């Protein structure tokens, strides 16, 4: 029994997690697997063609093939349904696949109708491996039964083809039957070959699904084969044995791989055990000589299926095999903190001491099953380190599947994939499962680079991706002189006598690569001067002979030859043609391979090494008047003041900033004043009507959501420069939480050192100013008694039964500029005097954000309210004086002693309290109180022949503003509205005398006659015609005289 471990390695917190964000994926560039024209192979529909794949490289043949398992394919075996096949596909242009005949027979019987084995649905081809002339293919669901038992047992079987010999290999078809033995072994669930020509077979169902590994020599399998013997014993067999019950349902043999882990030169056995350790999962490494335990690895998350896939390869070039373990159901917490299934691959790097250092790669998509398959690729790009492929067969667009290519390096696996292969086939009845099976590390086209097969059994496909030869380019670029003196003009522009300052540009290429590559490589080289200048901007340097900032050149390089160079002359434009003298001039070189001419006979094109940049740049500097070091160091300063100390919220506040900018150091190039303005301010312009202020050129712009005013201060802003300028703003969009507005000012330049001034902030405080007024009016303002035809009624029902309508209107108006959010309005109404009613309130209305309540019942007698109103509710108070009253005034000679004033100091008053909501600038809230003059009171004998002044009063106080952090003063005021009641006779209007009317008409007629005479004397009534041709006059004249006819 080989289960007890020699050393257990738990993949816990000591590992170094490499958690990759999906944001890194767009950075992955396609490297050297050819994704543009892969070779695609297809099998019978529904056969699961592609469930297992491998290369087949017979040693005695120059041809190379692909092996593809189709475990649900039908065969020619008599009486067998979906027996399964392994197909051999020619990788060349024909791409034909032919089934390999391993077994042409049907089920064998003990006797007629007494079968020994059951080959239907046996899934032959579910696992396939090859080594030189040898092919091992298995059917893990093959069933058989002993003569004494009737139950079918899925022991599994395999067929081994060695050259021309084909033998059956069924190590689990033994006398150790039933579930406690090898009856449910499913031998061949996973398989592999060792370097020493041993086969390694996994049977995860043996011993109550503890699982089992079995290894036998190829030579002994072939030599001992006897078709008449069902259970063959092998002398040199290595196998794990049954263990304690605690190991039941572990699935040893679920996945297998081989590699040397103890340094004895013999391949050891690696197996995934995904349900071991209470479903944490384990991976066992057994000694390839005696099946003793070497190392164990334990997963860290239950049910992650740690060990679903395993692989072994030296990824970091230290000659020690490293272990890769897939856990496709691993769950990780997303950005929202919730667990989600992403899959994980553990990478355990073997050290010289036999220890392992483990890092982890998490998947990039949810439910993609990252780590379902892992395939060593060999040295895919020939950089000296092996590479590896990891599949996420249900990832990508529409779950078509993804395969990630990771490159090895000296420190281990590069955590960012260098290439991503995506499935291109839509799902049928099931997902395509692109990447569920993979095999690499074989150079099928013999170009010196290993290739990769990817299976997609859900669409019955297998895809061959060939590796493209990698070309490494060494590029050189030299600029001299690197300091350009504008005054040193030693070159002449061709065709002119104009002298210019020039410099040399020298560029070189060298190319080499491994594998099959052409001897000559063609490149297109692009040179660009002043690369960093944006498109459309003036480039400060041009090539001398083309007068262009760019240059193209085709260069043919000998592979592996010496560096090949060429040289060009460039010149500097005149300084009057550009502003930027400080920024270095970047000379940029880019090269591209002519892939078409570099392709091989099959059309496969090489590729440039992605780890070598395809461009190079150098810089040249313009000589400046900045001392010996050619480095200008300005000393920039800015100060600011404003013409306003306070800004009132809600007002259109004009604000002028007086800015002083100065440079006390060396020249500042492309100097600009940057004013960051708050959201509450808008830039109006520069003050230009003051001779003491500089008229700067300024513009408004938005950069990174920051609103700025940018003003040009000169190029350069010379030493000792002082500028005073005025900038005008309008501040009018303050929020309710603001207490001030802030402007940030800074001078910026393009200098390398001391390029900016300190930021200066200028704050202007905000203040609240609300001019709130209250005004009122009475309609009518005068009532004359007695009322014609009025009769007293004991129980009045209508308005006419009581008396005339009297309405008081109060308007609370905010003239701003600031708003208020709440105010209280208090109205006192003269209601009774000596128990006699004065003004009987029928109802009150409001217009605006206001709610009112009264301390007494309104209209307790339920007097019917007339639909005809003497005044309109929506009339403004200001318009009341312009309306004609129903009762007109007359001049009365009344002394103060004749008027009795009845206000709240004398009469009993009704109170109405109103809460007024928010009023912005220019808004009003209006209260309309409609009442009836209680005529009966004033018709009493003791009250007759007296005049009365009935006064209501209203007062308000603002109690709340929307501005939370600003000091606010109390705002209050009041007003009175008076209705006069007078005894007397209303004067009738005087009629206009008839003689006045006649005189007015005569005067009008006389004026009209004078106007007509004056206009006649001035020729106003004479008709003026434009000049006419003689013929036209002749035609028109008869008509003018009235003597013409109708003929023309």
Swiss-Prot record:
Q: Which residues are glycosylated?
A: 74, 290, 296, 488, 554, 615, 704, 835, 851, 874, 945, 973, 980
Q: Where are the FG-GAP repeats?
A: 32-98, 109-170, 173-225, 237-291, 292-357, 358-415, 419-482
Q: Where is the signal peptide?
A: 1-30
Q: Which organism is it from?
A: Homo sapiens
**Which ranges make up the Extracellular topological domains here?**
31-992
Q: What else is known?
A: The constitutive activation of ITGAV:ITGB3 on neoplastic cells may contribute to tumor growth and metastatic potential.
Positions that bind Ca(2+) 3: 379, 381, 383, 385, 387
What binding partners and quaternary form does the record give?
Heterodimer of an alpha and a beta subunit. The alpha subunit is composed of a heavy and a light chain linked by a disulfide bond. Alpha-V (ITGAV) associates with either beta-1 (ITGB1), beta-3 (ITGB3), beta-5 (ITGB5), beta-6 (ITGB6) or beta-8 (ITGB8). Interacts with CIB1. Interacts with RAB25. Integrins ITGAV:ITGB3 and ITGAV:ITGB5 interact with FBLN5 (via N-terminus). ITGAV:ITGB3 and ITGAV:ITGB5 interact with CCN3. ITGAV:ITGB3 interacts with ADGRA2. ITGAV:ITGB3 interacts with FGF2; it is likely that FGF2 can simultaneously bind ITGAV:ITGB3 and FGF receptors. ITGAV:ITGB3 interacts with IL1B. (Microbial infection) Integrin ITGAV:ITGB3 interacts with herpes virus 8/HHV-8 envelope glycoprotein B.
Q: Which domain of life is it from?
A: Eukaryota
Q: What is this protein called?
A: Integrin alpha-V
């Amino acid at each position: 029994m080989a289960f007890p471990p020699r050393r257990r390695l738990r993949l816990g917190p000591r590992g170094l997690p490499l958690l990759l964000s999906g944001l890194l994926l767009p950075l992955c560039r396609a490297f050297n697997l050819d994704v543009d024209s892969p070779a695609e192979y297809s099998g019978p529909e529904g056969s699961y063609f592609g469930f297992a794949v491998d290369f087949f490289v017979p040693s005695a043949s120059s041809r190379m093939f692909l092996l593809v398992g189709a475990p649900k394919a039908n065969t020619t075996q008599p009486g067998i349904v979906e027996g399964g096949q392994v197909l051999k596909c020619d990788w060349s242009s024909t791409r034909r696949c032919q089934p390999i005949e391993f077994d042409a027979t049907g089920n064998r019987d003990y006797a007629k109708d007494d079968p020994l084995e059951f080959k239907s649905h046996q899934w032959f081809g579910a696992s396939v491996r090859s080594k030189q002339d040898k092919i091992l293919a298995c059917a893990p669901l093959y069933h058989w039964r002993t003569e004494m038992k009737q139950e079918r047992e899925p022991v599994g079987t395999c067929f081994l083809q060695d050259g021309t010999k084909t033998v059956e290999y069924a190590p689990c078809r033994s006398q150790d039957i039933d579930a406690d033995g090898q009856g449910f072994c499913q031998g061949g669930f996973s398989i592999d070959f060792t370097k020493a020509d041993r086969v390694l077979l996994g049977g995860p169902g043996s011993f109550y699904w503890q699982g089992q590994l079995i290894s036998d020599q190829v030579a002994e399998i072939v030599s001992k084969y006897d078709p008449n013997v069902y259970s063959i014993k092998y002398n040199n067999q290595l196998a794990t044995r049954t263990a304690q019950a605690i190991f039941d349902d572990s699935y040893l043999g679920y996945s297998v791989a081989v590699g040397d882990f103890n340094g004895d030169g013999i391949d050891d056995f690696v197996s995934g055990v995904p349900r071991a350790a209470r479903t944490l999962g384990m991976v066992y490494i057994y000694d390839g000589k005696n099946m003793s335990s070497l190392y164990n690895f334990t997963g860290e998350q239950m049910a992650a299926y740690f060990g679903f896939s395993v692989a072994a390869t030296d990824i970091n070039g230290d000659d020690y095999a490293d272990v890769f373990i897939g856990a496709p159901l691993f769950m990780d917490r997303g950005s929202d903190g919730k667990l989600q299934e992403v899959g994980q691959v553990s990478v355990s790097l073997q050290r010289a001491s036999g220890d392992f250092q483990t890092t982890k790669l998490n998947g990039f998509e949810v439910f993609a099953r990252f780590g379902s398959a892992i395939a060593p690729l060999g040295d895919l790009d020939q950089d000296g380190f092996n590479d590896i492929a990891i599949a996420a067969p249900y990832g990508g667009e529409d779950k078509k599947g993804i395969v990630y290519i990771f490159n090895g390096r000296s420190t281990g696996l590069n955590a960012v994939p260098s290439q991503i292969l995506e499935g291109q086939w839509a799902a049928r009845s099931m997902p395509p499962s692109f990447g569920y099976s993979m095999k690499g590390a074989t150079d099928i086209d013999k170009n010196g680079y290993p290739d990769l097969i990817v299976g997609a059994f859900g669409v019955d496909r297998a895809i061959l991706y060939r590796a493209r030869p990698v070309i490494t380019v060494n590029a050189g670029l030299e600029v001299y002189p690197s300091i350009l003196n504008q005054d040193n003009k030693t070159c002449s522009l061709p065709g002119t006598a104009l002298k210019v300052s020039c410099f040399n540009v020298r560029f070189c290429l060298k190319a080499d690569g491994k594998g099959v590559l052409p001897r000559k490589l063609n490149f297109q080289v692009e040179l660009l001067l002043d690369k960093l200048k944006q498109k459309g901007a003036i480039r400060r340097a041009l090539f001398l002979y083309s007068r262009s900032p760019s240059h193209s050149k085709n260069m043919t390089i000998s592979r592996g030859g010496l560096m090949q160079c060429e040289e060009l002359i460039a010149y500097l434009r005149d300084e009057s043609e550009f502003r930027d003298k400080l920024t270095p001039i970047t000379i940029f070189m880019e090269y591209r391979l002519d892939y078409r001419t570099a392709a091989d006979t099959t059309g496969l094109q090489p590729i440039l090494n992605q780890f070598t940049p395809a461009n190079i740049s150098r810089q040249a500097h313009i000589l400046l008047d900045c001392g010996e070091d050619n480095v200008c160091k300005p000393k920039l300063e800015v100060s600011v003041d404003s013409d306003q100390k306070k800004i009132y919220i809600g007002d259109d506040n004009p604000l002028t900033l007086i800015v002083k900018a100065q440079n006390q150091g060396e020249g500042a190039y492309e100097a600009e004043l940057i004013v960051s303005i708050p959201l509450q301010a808008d830039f109006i312009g520069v003050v230009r009507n003051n001779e003491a202020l500089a008229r700067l050129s300024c513009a408004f712009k938005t950069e990174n959501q920051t609103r700025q005013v940018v003003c040009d201060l000169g190029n350069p802003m010379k030493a000792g420069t002082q500028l005073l300028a005025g900038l005008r703003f309008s501040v009018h969009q303050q929020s309710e939480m603001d207490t001030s507005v802030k402007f940030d000012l800074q001078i910026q330049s393009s200098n390398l050192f001391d390029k900016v001034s300190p930021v200066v902030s200028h704050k202007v405080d905000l203040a609240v100013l609300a001019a709130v007024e209250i005004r009122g009016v009475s309609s009518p303002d005068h009532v004359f008694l007695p009322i014609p035809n009025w009769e007293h009624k004991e129980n009045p029902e209508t308005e006419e039964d009581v008396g005339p309508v009297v309405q008081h209107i109060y308007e609370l108006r905010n003239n701003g500029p600031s708003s208020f959010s709440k105010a209280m309005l208090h109205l006192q109404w003269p209601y009774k005097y000596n128990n006699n009613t004065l003004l009987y309130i029928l109802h009150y209305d409001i217009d605006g954000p206001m709610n009112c309540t009264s301390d007494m019942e309104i209209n307790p007698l339920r007097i019917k309210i007339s639909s005809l109103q003497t005044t309109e509710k929506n009339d403004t108070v200001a318009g009341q004086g312009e309306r004609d009253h129903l009762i007109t005034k007359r001049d009365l000679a009344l002394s103060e002693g004749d008027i009795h004033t009845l206000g709240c100091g004398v009469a009993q008053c009704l109170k109405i309290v109103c809460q007024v909501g928010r009023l912005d600038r220019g808004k009003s809230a209006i209260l309309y109180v409609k009442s009836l003059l209680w005529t009966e009171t004033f018709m009493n004998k003791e009250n007759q022949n007296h005049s009365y002044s009935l006064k209501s009063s209203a007062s308000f106080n603002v109690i709340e503003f929307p501005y939370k952090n600003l000091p606010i003063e109390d705002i209050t005021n009041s007003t009175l509205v008076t209705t006069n009641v007078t005894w007397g006779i209303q004067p009738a209007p005087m009629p206009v005398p008839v003689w006045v009317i006649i005189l007015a008409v005569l005067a009008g007629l006389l004026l009209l006659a004078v106007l007509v005479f004056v206009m006649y004397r001035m020729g106003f009534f004479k008709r003026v015609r434009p000049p006419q041709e003689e013929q036209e006059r002749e035609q028109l004249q008869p008509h003018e005289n009235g003597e013409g006819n109708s003929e023309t």
